[in-house]
Amino acid sequence: MKRFMQIWKPAVVGFLLLTLMCGVVYPGIVTIFASAAFHDKANGSIIEEKRADGTTGKVGSAEIGQTFTKPEYLIGRAASDGVATNLNPTSEEQKQLVEKRIAWWHKLDPTNNRVIPMDLVTASASGVDPDISEAAAAYQVDRISRERGISTKQVKEIIAEHTSDRLLGFWGEPTVNVLQVNLALDRLKM
């Protein structure tokens, strides 16, 4: 029994210490640091808007994509909605999904005969990307302009206001935040 305790006591103590350090102390320190250094992002980047009745309400997060399907809105990437996002790019299932999404885009805007940008017909790995490429936003400018009765110049200006540059100036591609563009478009009515 003494030999058993000599073996198991350090293992149990080590397990408890590692659990405390990795499960409580480290996450606590990271949370405190994130809340202090990146308060808005650490709390979900919640966007609040003034409503017609004068109250302010939460409308969404700048970091989580929302589904927009009305033609007067900028529409983001396809949501995964229970569909696997890790499909083989050459699989029949992926091909059918993309064809279905292409047909949806053609039905939404039958006058647009340009090539549909890839990010509008494929889901992201997370399935909730808040951003689309500049090409995907540009593809939708004419439709939004027509549906809202505003100039394409106004739509392009709003898109430009909500376009983020490359990370550190060289990493990745510029992206357009879909929710922020749509909120700005809605504010034009006011």
From Swiss-Prot:
Keyword field: ATP-binding, Cell membrane, Ion transport, Membrane, Nucleotide-binding, Potassium, Potassium transport, Transmembrane, Transmembrane helix, Transport
Transmembrane segments: 13-33
InterPro entries the UniProt entry points to: KdpC
Signal peptide stretch: none
Subcellular location: Cell membrane
Keyword Cell membrane: yes
Record bears the keyword Disulfide bond: no
Main location: membrane
Membrane topology recorded in Swiss-Prot or TrEMBL: Single-pass membrane protein
GO MF, one example: P-type potassium transmembrane transporter activity
GO-annotated cellular components: plasma membrane
Domain of life: Bacteria
Coiled coil: none
Quaternary context: The system is composed of three essential subunits: KdpA, KdpB and KdpC.
Family the entry assigns: Belongs to the KdpC family.
PANTHER family xrefs: POTASSIUM-TRANSPORTING ATPASE C CHAIN (PTHR30042), POTASSIUM-TRANSPORTING ATPASE KDPC SUBUNIT (PTHR30042:SF2)
Cited function: Part of the high-affinity ATP-driven potassium transport (or Kdp) system, which catalyzes the hydrolysis of ATP coupled with the electrogenic transport of potassium into the cytoplasm. This subunit acts as a catalytic chaperone that increases the ATP-binding affinity of the ATP-hydrolyzing subunit KdpB by the formation of a transient KdpB/KdpC/ATP ternary complex.
Protein name: Potassium-transporting ATPase KdpC subunit
